[in-house]
Amino acid sequence: YSSAASDVYKRQFNRSARDNIMYGNPNATEKDLIRSSRQAEAHEFIQDLEDHRGRKGYDAHLGEQGVKLSGGQRQRIALARAILKDSPVLVLDEATSALDSEVENSIQNALELVMENKTVLAIAHRLSTLAKMDRIIVLSDGQIVEEGTHKKLLKINGLYRQYWDKQSGGFITTEQAAE
Protein backbone atom coordinates (compact mmCIF):
# COMPACT_ATOMS: atom_id res chain seq x y z
CA TYR A 1 0.00 0.00 0.00
CA SER A 2 1.28 3.42 -0.90
CA SER A 3 -0.33 6.83 -0.75
CA ALA A 4 0.63 10.37 -1.62
CA ALA A 5 -0.68 13.46 0.11
CA SER A 6 -0.63 17.06 -0.97
CA ASP A 7 0.06 18.21 2.59
CA VAL A 8 0.97 21.79 1.92
CA TYR A 9 2.73 23.30 4.89
CA LYS A 10 4.04 20.63 7.24
CA ARG A 11 6.28 18.79 4.81
CA GLN A 12 8.36 21.52 3.27
CA PHE A 13 12.02 21.16 4.15
CA ASN A 14 14.83 23.70 4.26
CA ARG A 15 16.36 21.93 1.31
CA SER A 16 16.37 22.54 -2.42
CA ALA A 17 13.22 22.59 -4.52
CA ARG A 18 14.60 19.42 -6.15
CA ASP A 19 14.97 17.64 -2.78
CA ASN A 20 11.49 18.73 -1.66
CA ILE A 21 9.87 17.26 -4.77
CA MET A 22 12.12 14.18 -5.04
CA TYR A 23 11.14 13.28 -1.47
CA GLY A 24 8.05 11.78 -3.12
CA ASN A 25 10.20 9.39 -5.16
CA PRO A 26 13.98 9.51 -4.52
CA ASN A 27 14.63 7.20 -7.49
CA ALA A 28 12.88 9.44 -10.02
CA THR A 29 14.79 10.85 -12.96
CA GLU A 30 15.36 14.52 -13.71
CA LYS A 31 12.85 14.13 -16.55
CA ASP A 32 10.25 12.80 -14.08
CA LEU A 33 11.00 15.71 -11.72
CA ILE A 34 10.42 18.27 -14.48
CA ARG A 35 7.26 16.50 -15.72
CA SER A 36 5.68 16.44 -12.25
CA SER A 37 6.66 20.08 -11.67
CA ARG A 38 5.09 21.12 -14.96
CA GLN A 39 1.90 19.20 -14.16
CA ALA A 40 1.70 20.98 -10.80
CA GLU A 41 2.30 24.37 -12.47
CA ALA A 42 5.50 24.74 -10.43
CA HIS A 43 8.24 24.53 -13.07
CA GLU A 44 8.08 28.17 -14.16
CA PHE A 45 8.36 29.73 -10.72
CA ILE A 46 11.00 27.18 -9.64
CA GLN A 47 13.22 28.28 -12.53
CA ASP A 48 13.08 31.84 -11.16
CA LEU A 49 14.00 30.91 -7.57
CA GLU A 50 17.24 32.10 -6.01
CA ASP A 51 18.22 31.67 -2.37
CA HIS A 52 20.49 33.85 -0.19
CA ARG A 53 23.55 31.78 -1.20
CA GLY A 54 22.96 32.28 -4.91
CA ARG A 55 21.61 28.79 -5.61
CA LYS A 56 19.08 28.99 -8.42
CA GLY A 57 16.14 27.09 -9.82
CA TYR A 58 15.73 23.54 -8.60
CA ASP A 59 18.89 23.92 -6.48
CA ALA A 60 17.57 26.93 -4.52
CA HIS A 61 16.70 26.17 -0.89
CA LEU A 62 13.11 26.92 0.11
CA GLY A 63 13.61 27.85 3.76
CA GLU A 64 12.13 26.10 6.78
CA GLN A 65 8.60 24.88 5.90
CA GLY A 66 8.92 26.69 2.56
CA VAL A 67 8.88 30.09 4.29
CA LYS A 68 10.38 31.78 1.22
CA LEU A 69 7.46 30.71 -0.96
CA SER A 70 3.90 31.96 -1.24
CA GLY A 71 1.08 29.69 -0.08
CA GLY A 72 0.26 28.84 -3.69
CA GLN A 73 3.90 28.02 -4.46
CA ARG A 74 4.14 25.74 -1.42
CA GLN A 75 0.96 24.04 -2.56
CA ARG A 76 2.36 23.48 -6.04
CA ILE A 77 5.60 22.00 -4.64
CA ALA A 78 3.52 19.59 -2.51
CA LEU A 79 1.40 18.66 -5.54
CA ALA A 80 4.50 18.05 -7.66
CA ARG A 81 5.79 15.71 -4.93
CA ALA A 82 2.46 13.83 -4.82
CA ILE A 83 2.38 13.57 -8.63
CA LEU A 84 5.97 12.28 -8.69
CA LYS A 85 5.17 9.62 -6.10
CA ASP A 86 2.46 8.20 -8.40
CA SER A 87 0.72 6.18 -5.69
CA PRO A 88 -2.51 4.22 -6.20
CA VAL A 89 -4.08 6.32 -3.43
CA LEU A 90 -3.92 10.10 -3.58
CA VAL A 91 -4.99 12.31 -0.67
CA LEU A 92 -5.73 15.91 -1.63
CA ASP A 93 -6.26 18.09 1.43
CA GLU A 94 -7.41 21.49 0.18
CA ALA A 95 -5.21 20.96 -2.88
CA THR A 96 -6.18 24.21 -4.58
CA SER A 97 -7.11 26.44 -1.65
CA ALA A 98 -4.20 28.91 -1.95
CA LEU A 99 -4.24 29.22 -5.73
CA ASP A 100 -5.63 31.93 -7.95
CA SER A 101 -8.40 30.89 -10.35
CA GLU A 102 -6.18 30.59 -13.43
CA VAL A 103 -3.59 28.34 -11.76
CA GLU A 104 -6.36 26.39 -10.01
CA ASN A 105 -7.98 25.60 -13.36
CA SER A 106 -4.65 24.44 -14.84
CA ILE A 107 -3.92 22.23 -11.85
CA GLN A 108 -7.44 20.77 -11.88
CA ASN A 109 -6.90 19.79 -15.52
CA ALA A 110 -3.54 18.19 -14.67
CA LEU A 111 -5.03 16.42 -11.65
CA GLU A 112 -7.69 14.83 -13.85
CA LEU A 113 -4.93 12.89 -15.62
CA VAL A 114 -3.06 12.13 -12.40
CA MET A 115 -6.22 10.86 -10.65
CA GLU A 116 -7.11 8.45 -13.45
CA ASN A 117 -7.26 4.84 -12.14
CA LYS A 118 -6.47 5.95 -8.59
CA THR A 119 -8.42 6.12 -5.38
CA VAL A 120 -8.60 9.80 -4.46
CA LEU A 121 -9.64 11.19 -1.12
CA ALA A 122 -10.16 14.91 -1.68
CA ILE A 123 -10.94 17.24 1.18
CA ALA A 124 -12.12 20.57 -0.16
CA HIS A 125 -14.16 23.60 0.71
CA ARG A 126 -13.72 24.94 -2.82
CA LEU A 127 -16.31 22.75 -4.51
CA SER A 128 -15.02 23.30 -8.04
CA THR A 129 -12.17 20.99 -7.00
CA LEU A 130 -14.69 18.16 -6.57
CA ALA A 131 -17.00 18.70 -9.55
CA LYS A 132 -15.50 15.93 -11.72
CA MET A 133 -15.14 13.29 -8.99
CA ASP A 134 -16.94 9.95 -9.44
CA ARG A 135 -18.35 10.10 -5.93
CA ILE A 136 -18.71 13.01 -3.53
CA ILE A 137 -19.55 12.54 0.13
CA VAL A 138 -20.95 15.55 1.98
CA LEU A 139 -20.38 15.69 5.74
CA SER A 140 -22.18 17.82 8.29
CA ASP A 141 -21.39 17.62 12.00
CA GLY A 142 -19.33 14.48 11.34
CA GLN A 143 -22.20 12.66 9.62
CA ILE A 144 -22.67 11.73 5.96
CA VAL A 145 -25.68 13.73 4.80
CA GLU A 146 -25.42 13.33 1.01
CA GLU A 147 -23.45 11.38 -1.54
CA GLY A 148 -23.35 11.12 -5.30
CA THR A 149 -21.86 12.78 -8.35
CA HIS A 150 -21.68 16.54 -8.70
CA LYS A 151 -24.63 16.49 -11.10
CA LYS A 152 -26.76 14.31 -8.79
CA LEU A 153 -25.96 16.42 -5.74
CA LEU A 154 -26.98 19.59 -7.56
CA LYS A 155 -30.31 18.00 -8.52
CA ILE A 156 -31.28 16.91 -5.00
CA ASN A 157 -31.16 20.52 -3.83
CA GLY A 158 -29.50 19.76 -0.49
CA LEU A 159 -26.48 21.02 1.43
CA TYR A 160 -24.04 20.54 -1.46
CA ARG A 161 -26.31 22.57 -3.76
CA GLN A 162 -26.57 25.34 -1.15
CA TYR A 163 -22.78 25.58 -0.89
CA TRP A 164 -22.37 25.38 -4.67
CA ASP A 165 -24.83 28.23 -5.18
CA LYS A 166 -23.01 30.38 -2.59
CA GLN A 167 -19.60 29.73 -4.13
CA SER A 168 -20.65 30.23 -7.74
CA GLY A 169 -22.14 33.58 -6.72
CA GLY A 170 -24.64 33.65 -9.52
CA PHE A 171 -22.03 34.00 -12.28
CA ILE A 172 -23.10 30.71 -13.78
CA THR A 173 -26.35 28.93 -13.23
CA THR A 174 -26.47 25.62 -11.41
CA GLU A 175 -27.85 24.08 -14.59
CA GLN A 176 -24.82 25.28 -16.59
CA ALA A 177 -22.50 23.84 -13.95
CA ALA A 178 -24.24 20.46 -14.12
CA GLU A 179 -23.58 20.11 -17.86
Language model features with spans:
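Short loop/turn and capping residues at structural boundaries
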Residues: 48-51, 73, 141, 164-165
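Cationic, histidine-enriched alpha-helical/coil surfaces that engage anionic ligands
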Residues: 26
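ABC-family ATPase nucleotide-binding domain "signature/switch" substructure
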Residues: 6-7, 15-22, 31-40, 56-157
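Generic alpha-helical structural context detector
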Residues: 34-38, 47, 161, 165
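Conserved H-loop
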Residues: 39, 43-55
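C-terminal boundary and immediately downstream tail of ABC-type ATPase nucleotide-binding domains
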Residues: 155-179
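Single conserved hydrophobic/aromatic residue that forms the stacking wall/gate
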Residues: 1-9
